[in-house]
Design a protein with these regions (language model features):
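Outer-membrane beta-barrel porins/channels
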Residues: 1-20, 84-181
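N-terminal, post-signal peptide beta-strand-biased segments of exported outer-membrane/organellar beta-barrel
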Residues: 1-106
Length: 181
């Protein structure tokens, strides 16, 4: 799944680098100094659906007896993704000239993709073995399921230097959680 949006509000406003808003903390954390004094909390979630089609051409695919290969040796491997909830959370505490803030969310990935008929690199290995050994054909029961979630955490502080200038110091980390079957 391809999602690098940081939060659901990004889908409505792509230029978050220049936005002064709580939901822009990931892209513009220094902007938190210009929010109203007090606590600011945001929780958002989005749902994502996506299809991935991999088209590969290999003359050896013609040996596969399943009938899914075109006359020129091209096969399409179709994968579907559904991520019901991709969350993000933003917090800021703002005073006169300073603020502290944090962001947590799924910053990339966010879903599980299933390829019911496998993927081209796996098929190419078997097809290549059948072809180089002169076999009349092959069958392959292949399946691939991959999950990728990249959780981002950012914590830091902002100081308002001038009425229209602030500086941010913080740390950002990403934890990858990936699995393939």
């Amino acid at each position: 799944l391809t999602t690098t949006s940081q939060n659901a509000h990004y889908l409505r406003f792509f230029s978050q680098d220049a936005d002064i808003n709580l939901t822009s903390l990931y892209a513009n954390p220094a902007g938190s100094a210009f929010l109203n004094k007090g606590w600011h909390i945001s929780a958002s979630a989005m749902t994502a659906m996506q299809s991935r089609n991999i088209t590969a051409t290999n003359p050896a695919y013609l040996l596969n007896a399943d009938g899914l290969t075109s006359a020129n040796g091209t096969r399409t491997f179709e994968g579907d993704v559904f991520a019901p909830v991709i969350p993000s959370f933003d917090f800021a505490y703002v005073q006169d000239k300073w603020s502290v803030s944090a962001h947590f969310g799924v910053v990339a990935g966010g879903g599980t993709c299933e390829f019911e008929n496998g993927i081209s690199p796996l098929e190419s290995l078997v097809a290549g073995l059948a072809y180089t050994n002169g076999l009349p054909g092959y069958t392959l029961d292949s399946y691939m399921k991959g999950k990728q979630n990249y959780f981002g955490l950012q914590v830091g502080g902002t100081y308002k230097i001038l009425d229209n200038l602030s500086a941010y110091v913080g740390v950002r980390g990403v934890l990858a959680s990936c699995a393939y079957n």
